[in-house]
Amino acid sequence: GLPDEQKYMGMGVSACATCDGFFYRRKVVAVVGGGDTACEEASYLASLASKVYMIVRKPYLRASQIMQERVMQTPNIEILFENTPTGLYGENGLEGVHLTYRAGQEDQREYDLDIDGFFLAIGHHPNSTLFTKWLETDEAGYIKTIGDTPCTAVEGVYAAGDVADPRYRQAIIAAGSGAKAAME
């Protein structure tokens, strides 16, 4: 996390484009990350915001080919490769992000990017390592369930919430999956 991330949470910083994207209709936003989640968030926000910057630390996207093509073909998405966010600024809410281009390189430079919204789309890892000894997980660490049920391969053991949900990662959906597990 960035030093001022919590200070601006709900005042320009968000971790959920589908939850907060409508606040940024016809505004300028940035999405941090280079994977599928970041591309999905950027694509969704592009339908609302006037401009979407994708801030990517690496010189390439880690996202699947189809997601890369989607963001690259969207006219109001601009990808800022080799940029690292170092801080946020603003008086009565978020006004921008401090960036370092090519950190640690000879041509490194720091600059500010004025934005209205800052969306975090990195570091989504399920908190499932405690259970990997007993339960099967996918390559990203999500606990595998049987079909669309919360049942795992271990009888009487259920997985609910974000540890079993690589797609939505929303509190209301996690609560619903908890209810499903309780009913099993």
Locate each region found by the language model.
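Short amphipathic alpha-helical segments
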Residues: G1-D4, A42-Y44, I66-M67, L130-K133, ...
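Glycine-rich dinucleotide-binding loop and its adjacent helix/turn
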Residues: G1-L48, T145-I146
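FAD-site-proximal beta/loop scaffold in flavoenzymes
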Residues: Q6-F23, I122-Y168, I173, S177
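Cofactor-binding loop segments of dinucleotide-utilizing enzymes, especially the Rossmann-like FAD-
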Residues: T18, G34, R57-P59, D162
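Phosphate-coordination loops involved in phosphoryl transfer and adenosine-cofactor binding
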Residues: R25-K27, E82, V154
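Internal hydrophobic alpha-helix adjacent to the cofactor/substrate pocket in enzyme cavities
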Residues: S43, S47-Y53, I172-E184
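A Rossmann-like FAD-binding core segment of flavoenzymes
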Residues: S47-G147
